[in-house]
Amino acid sequence: KMTISAPANQFCYHCGLEVPQQGDFSLVIQGIRRAMCCPGCAAVAATIFENGLQSFYKFRSAPSSQIVENSYSEAQGNPYADWDLEEIQSEYVSHTDQGQLSIRLYIGNITCAACTWLIEQHVGKLPGIDRIAINGTTRRGEIIWTPETLSLSQILRAIKQIGYDASPINQH
């Protein structure tokens, strides 16, 4: 039985941790095989490149945090679905005069300006996002969106998809 293993002392292209000897989670990115330490980092790196956001790697000042794999599967449905319930949103979401919704979030794992840029670019491309502003220093952000086009759960899921954890901040 043949086992694929990473060469010794190779480091993850996404998070910078040492790549384990067992398992091969590498990706070919722009014609170069890049080592990844886990399927989570490989998935996030693939998402970043698939969405044309590879400048993130050029401008970041430190490796990204290691990705903790999602504890849910697509078959289990949307893990953020409860955030779409009015009784839960009422504590966290405010309404604008134009009929949009606004939420403030705490976003963990931000380590540099490139993280902020990545989140703003990735989420900002979603249909229905009217405004997104992230402060990398405080790790807080505000998002304004059109609820008929996009749900809060879709926004939270998009943030998680690129490796960040977003926690809504109570508005009251």
Language-model features, listed with the residues they occupy:
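Flexible metal-binding regulatory segments at protein termini and peripheral loops
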Residues: 1-172
